[in-house]
């Protein structure tokens, strides 16, 4: 298992399907060891969710969109939010990804929570933004907020991700 470099990521972005679609500025978003994802939308989480073993009783709570100001900024009070990214990711069957918040978020008292990005996943993903700073946190639309780190798998998976979130938010 090896972490991909910017050179390898550039090649994969030019592949078919491309590793990353709908980038705001691909060259800016390519980092030495990963790809940065940008903020498309922020929502508040409304109500309780539920998770069980076989997903037969899974319930993802509703979410209410928040509006950016005319200047493109939004001030978020302390709390949790759902964020949706601009980019659509197409992960090949021989890669997986782990996401980390950009260090600037952490230095401002906020962070992102996300799951493993499986081989074969395609979609415009969602993550949880947690604002810990009691004074809140400001974000601008299209801000670079997360970095995806791609790893090669020792062997290609026989069957890639096929869960309910496949192709999410791509319409």
Curated annotation (Swiss-Prot):
Catalytic activities: dUTP + H2O = dUMP + diphosphate + H(+)
EC number: 3.6.1.23
GO biological process terms, semicolon-separated: dUMP biosynthetic process; dUTP biosynthetic process
Listed GO MF terms: dCTP deaminase activity; dUTP diphosphatase activity
Keyword Hydrolase: yes
CDD domains in the record: trimeric_dUTPase
Superkingdom of the source species: Archaea
Pathway: Pyrimidine metabolism; dUMP biosynthesis; dUMP from dCTP (dUTP route): step 2/2
Alphabetical UniProt keywords: Hydrolase, Nucleotide metabolism
Listed InterPro entries: dCTP_deaminase (IPR011962), dUTPase-like_sf (IPR036157), dUTPase_archaeal (IPR023537), dUTPase_trimeric (IPR033704)
UniProt keyword annotation of Hydrolase present: yes
Protein function: This enzyme is involved in nucleotide metabolism: it produces dUMP, the immediate precursor of thymidine nucleotides and it decreases the intracellular concentration of dUTP so that uracil cannot be incorporated into DNA.
Family note: Belongs to the dCTP deaminase family. Archaeal dUTPase subfamily.
Stated name of the protein: Probable deoxyuridine 5'-triphosphate nucleotidohydrolase
Source organism: Methanosarcina mazei (strain ATCC BAA-159 / DSM 3647 / Goe1 / Go1 / JCM 11833 / OCM 88) (Methanosarcina frisia)
């Amino acid at each position: 298992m090896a972490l991909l470099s910017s050179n390898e990521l550039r090649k994969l972005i030019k592949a078919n399907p491309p590793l990353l679609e709908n980038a705001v500025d691909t060259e800016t978003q390519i980092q030495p060891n990963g790809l940065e994802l940008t903020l498309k939308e922020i929502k508040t989480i409304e109500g309780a969710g539920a998770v069980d073993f076989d997903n037969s009783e899974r319930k993802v709570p509703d979410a209410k969109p928040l509006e950016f100001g005319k200047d493109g900024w939004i001030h978020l009070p302390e709390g949790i939010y759902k964020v949706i990214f601009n980019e659509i990711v197409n992960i090949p069957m021989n890669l997986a990804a782990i996401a980390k918040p950009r260090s600037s978020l952490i230095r401002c008292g906020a962070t992102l929570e996300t799951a493993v990005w499986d081989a074969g996943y395609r979609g415009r993903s969602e993550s949880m933004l947690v604002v810990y700073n009691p004074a809140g946190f400001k974000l601008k639309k299209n801000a670079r907020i997360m970095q995806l780190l791609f790893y090669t798998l020792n062997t290609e998976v026989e069957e890639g991700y096929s869960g309910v979130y496949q192709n999410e938010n791509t319409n």
